[in-house]
Amino acid sequence: ALEVMSRFAANPKWLIYLPPTMSPCETSHEPGLLEHPTEAFAYYRYEGIEQVVCEEKHMGSRAVVIICRSEDVARQRFGVTGEGIGICYTRTGRRFFDDAALEAELLSRIRAALDVRGFWQTFSTDWVCLDCELMPWSVKAQALLLHQYAAVGAASRSALGEAVNLLEQAQAAGQDVDELLIKFRTQKQLTGQYVEAYRHYCWPVHSVADLKLAPFHILATQDEVHVNKGHAWHMDTLAQLCQADSELLLATPYKVVNVNDTSSLEEGIAWWHELTGRGGEGMVVKPSDFIARGRSGLVQPAVKCRGSEYLRIIYGPEYDLPENLERLRQRGLGRKRSLALREFALGIEGLERFVRSEPLRRVHECVFGVLALESEPVDPRL
């Protein structure tokens, strides 16, 4: 963690928080599905949590945004000079943008929205730390898209297209290749779905006008870490902020579900089907309280429930064939969930220390701890 920070991180004076990883819900036994909301709701019901907040999951990149009211505030509170009014950094503490002008314009737009909504006066603060998702996915994952997903898609479509053509010719010539042709046609179709799945989350970025930022947590302001407020409060408060610049800021749709009420559960499941049916990644299910305790102690701060087409990007074009799905259902979540809880606790503790004006080294004990945990081996598909 220390090596990564020393070689790649942004100015460490900005790094007061790193977000935790997130576990998926338990594996579903619904036909043809690996993940389904039923398991997410069942987890929280088992833990004694009655009400959950379901938020649309954006397919972008996690971003922590710190905005100061002025450069003087950045100097006085963060000890940073000559770097503008804030920063946008990744979940591993690296600067999100290589283009400093693009970052500066993004931060300026967010500050203007905060000005318009009277945020500084409402919260009696001169700075804010926001937890966000920045879209498109391709703005940060361009190399991954080109060298992993697009390369696989292009090679597969080319090879399978040629194979299907040859098999069709063989069939026309009277060869017994019917089963083989069906198999390769299925593979070709699934590869096409794979390509369409990742294309949905990519578009060119030439300026800040091509970006969308979806803030979902007000993490901290001058004298407070806002973990004492429920997720619905965060959603509603940030939705008001997003109205001040709807071209850049995206309010996250959400739905409150009572996990003990059948009709409420059905509405939550139907909403998930609606989100994934139009190409969305899925949803994140959280207990209504920011910090919640259940039968086993601290419960997962969030679990993700992803749609079948998005999972095609993660597990490969043919993941949902019956023989593959049965194998994938054996995945284990224990390690991922343990990491999520520890990283969540460290993240909040780091913010609390910063708000209490403890020395930066004390804040960085928590920040570096999160980064160290993230270096532990765990299935990256979870």
Predicted regions and their residues:
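Conserved loop->alpha-helix
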Residues: V80-P136
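Short acidic, S/G/P-rich loop/turn micro-motifs used as interaction or catalytic elements
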Residues: R95, M135-V139, F290-A292, D320-L321
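Short linear interaction motifs
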Residues: P31-E50, L107-F123, S138, S264-E266
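Non-catalytic, alpha-helical, charged scaffold/linker segments
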Residues: L114-D210
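Short acidic, glycine/serine/threonine-rich loops at helix termini
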Residues: I66-R69, A100-A101, A141-H147, R295-S296
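Low-complexity, highly charged intrinsically disordered N-terminal segments
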Residues: A1-E39
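Nucleic-acid 5′ end/cap handling module spanning
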Residues: L34-T90, I182-L382
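Short, hydrophobic/amphipathic alpha-helical patches that form generic packing surfaces
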Residues: E3, D131-W137, A214-D223
